[in-house]
């Protein structure tokens, strides 16, 4: 059955969307398997994305887990960032080899950096009630500028040459400006939501955002593409069902189709048949003149004789024919190996 690839930056709602889709499909009586980072990482944490070797091993483990589960009977959901388009192409080839459909669900959090095509609603300010494990540096800059403006207004009369007003002996505590900038206030929802032990460090989040390769529906391995912005936007379940269960699977091609199995004696018979043709050609050309059609025993094809052929030239063409035939073995061609070799000689000799 189909493969669903969930894509997006950390804390963009991928796991929640995965669980929502899993419940919807299991409610219809379908078998659904979820492959995520937690089932592969084990005791490691999310900092594995900061190590190129560890991240490469993680992608290999995710690909192997998907390949084990992928079949024509079960739905497999891959819940991971999947931010490298080359890795998404590998998943596309896996689905194509099994002849099962594939779709991509791209989760975007409003206000987070996006390097792909512009998505409506993705540049809106994020909801402060939703807790995150990091805070953009711009938030601190705006608050620091606001504090500096208050201090500048407090000393502006003195800076413009004005006369300071008399200060009463007893000042109201509310009128006294603090010497240090006020601390950034955190909403109660953010105070109560503690980051998970495997929270992504800010530097790692910035690095992931920079090297994130957003999916593009113009690429065949990224379509059909369903983009979901935020957690309030409903998941297009009807469109996803149509893409998974009503669309035709991509047709296999040579890179994803298994080669036909050859018998154990195929190479031996190939070597024997071409060797016999080579010996017969060398013998027949002794009494032939240019323009004759050489008839060889055990073949129905004819070889047009145009000039004397050397054994070295025929041996080179024989090696080329054997190398090509070994790449495409087929037991059905065993009786026609000699005729195929003669056809190859007619096309190669000038």
UniProtKB/Swiss-Prot annotation:
GO biological process, one term: tRNA wobble uridine modification
Record keyword Secreted present: no
In-chain residues carrying the UniProt-annotated modification Phosphoserine: 156
Binding site for ATP: 8-15
Family annotation (Pfam families): KTI12
Family: Belongs to the KTI12 family.
Protein keywords: Acetylation, ATP-binding, Nucleotide-binding, Phosphoprotein
In-chain residues carrying the UniProt-annotated modification N6-acetyllysine: 143
Stretches for region Disordered: 161-196
Species: Rattus norvegicus (Rat)
Phylogenetic lineage: Eukaryota, Metazoa, Chordata, Craniata, Vertebrata
Any one GO molecular-function label of the UniProt entry: ATP binding
Gene3D superfamilies, A to Z: P-loop containing nucleotide triphosphate hydrolases
Protein name stated in the entry: Protein KTI12 homolog
């Amino acid at each position: 059955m189909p493969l669903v690839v969930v894509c997006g930056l950390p804390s963009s709602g991928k796991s929640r969307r995965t669980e929502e889709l899993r419940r919807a499909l299991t409610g219809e009586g379908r078998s659904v398997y979820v492959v995520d980072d937690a089932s592969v990482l084990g005791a490691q944490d999310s900092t594995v994305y900061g190590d190129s070797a560890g991240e490469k091993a993680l992608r290999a483990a995710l690909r192997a887990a998907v390949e084990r589960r992928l079949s024509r009977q079960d739905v497999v959901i891959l819940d991971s960032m999947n931010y490298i388009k080359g890795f998404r192409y590998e998943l596309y080839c896996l689905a194509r080899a099994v002849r099962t459909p594939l779709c991509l669900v791209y989760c975007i959090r409003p206000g987070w950096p996006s390097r792909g095509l512009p998505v409506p609603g993705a540049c809106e300010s994020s909801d402060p009630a939703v807790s995150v494990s990091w805070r953009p540096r711009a938030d601190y800059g705006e608050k620091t500028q606001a504090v500096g403006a208050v201090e500048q207004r407090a000393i502006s009369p003195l800076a413009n040459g004005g006369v300071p007003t008399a200060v009463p002996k007893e000042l109201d505590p509310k009128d006294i400006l603090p010497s240090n900038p006020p601390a950034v206030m955190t909403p109660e929802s953010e105070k109560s939501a503690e980051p998970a032990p495997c929270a992504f460090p800010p530097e790692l989040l910035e690095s992931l955002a920079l090297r994130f390769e957003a999916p593009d529906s113009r690429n065949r391995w990224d379509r059909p593409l369903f983009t979901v912005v935020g957690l309030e936007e409903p998941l297009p379940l009807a469109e996803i069902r149509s893409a998974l269960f009503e669309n035709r699977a991509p047709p296999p091609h040579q890179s994803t189709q298994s080669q036909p199995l050859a018998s154990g004696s195929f190479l031996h018979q190939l070597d024997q048949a071409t060797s016999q043709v080579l010996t017969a050609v060398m013998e027949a050309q002794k009494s032939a003149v240019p323009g004759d059609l050489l008839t060889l025993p055990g073949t129905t094809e004819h070889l047009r004789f145009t000039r004397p052929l050397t054994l070295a030239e025929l041996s080179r063409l024989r090696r080329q024919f054997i190398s090509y035939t070994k790449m495409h073995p087929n037991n059905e061609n065993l009786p026609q190996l000699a005729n195929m070799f003669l056809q190859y000689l007619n096309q190669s000799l000038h």
